[in-house]
Amino acid sequence: MARYTGPKCKLSRREGTDLFLKSARRSLDSKCKLDSKPGQHGRTSGARTSDYGLQLREKQKLKRMYGVLEKQFRKYFAEAERRRGNTGETLIQLLESRLDNVVYRMGFGSTRAEARQLVSHRAIELNGHTADIASMLVKAGDVITVREGAKKQARIRESLDLAASIGIPQWVEVDSNKMTGTFKSPPDRADVARDVNESMVVELYSR
């Protein structure tokens, strides 16, 4: 299955919540009508959604939020099941540990898609070595740096300025002048993906 390249607002409207697919430079309310489903008139059916349908929606939220396709998502779930602890929380921590997501959290990209592009264009170093695989998992203590040749890109500076105005997450440490950051640890569950019920995702894959 190919990666979705259509309108980003459409995905957020479908899930009824902000999936953080658009830059925060403008309020999402000015771009997307989250209370209206995609389509000419939206979906007005009052039919109750089945448990399976609700579980599927929660999975779709996570996949779309982090830009992950089904095959890769299943791998993350299998790894989360293999590890000790709460499977749903571990799944989200794995998604948060993806290189493209950490680049986004550090403010080098204004969206995960933009951060993924920086990685694929070899603009990012991980522990002093060029890293071009967006799905790489970052570990606590790993250092991420914008490569010298990419530091002149205006979009990176703009993204850093935007991140500084919004607030850098506490689980990463960033030196915006040097365009480098350290991944301190995976975030606490309460700090991320607050509109997602990951227990439903676990139930879906346990069917």
Swiss-Prot record:
The lineage of its organism: Bacteria, Pseudomonadati, Pseudomonadota, Betaproteobacteria, Burkholderiales. One of its GO terms (biological process) is ribosomal small subunit biogenesis. GO terms for cellular component: small ribosomal subunit. GO terms for molecular function: rRNA binding; structural constituent of ribosome. Residues 97-160 form the S4 RNA-binding domain. PANTHER family: 30S 40S RIBOSOMAL PROTEIN, SMALL RIBOSOMAL SUBUNIT PROTEIN US4M. PROSITE patterns: RIBOSOMAL_S4, S4. Residues 31-51 are annotated as: Disordered. Keywords: Ribonucleoprotein, Ribosomal protein, RNA-binding, rRNA-binding. The keyword Ribonucleoprotein applies. The keyword RNA-binding applies. Belongs to the universal ribosomal protein uS4 family. It comes from Bordetella avium (strain 197N). Pfam families: Ribosomal_S4 (PF00163), S4 (PF01479). InterPro entries: Ribosomal_uS4, Ribosomal_uS4_bac-type, Ribosomal_uS4_CS, Ribosomal_uS4_N, S4_RNA-bd, S4_RNA-bd_sf. One of the primary rRNA binding proteins, it binds directly to 16S rRNA where it nucleates assembly of the body of the 30S subunit. With S5 and S12 plays an important role in translational accuracy. This is Small ribosomal subunit protein uS4. Part of the 30S ribosomal subunit. Contacts protein S5. The interaction surface between S4 and S5 is involved in control of translational fidelity.
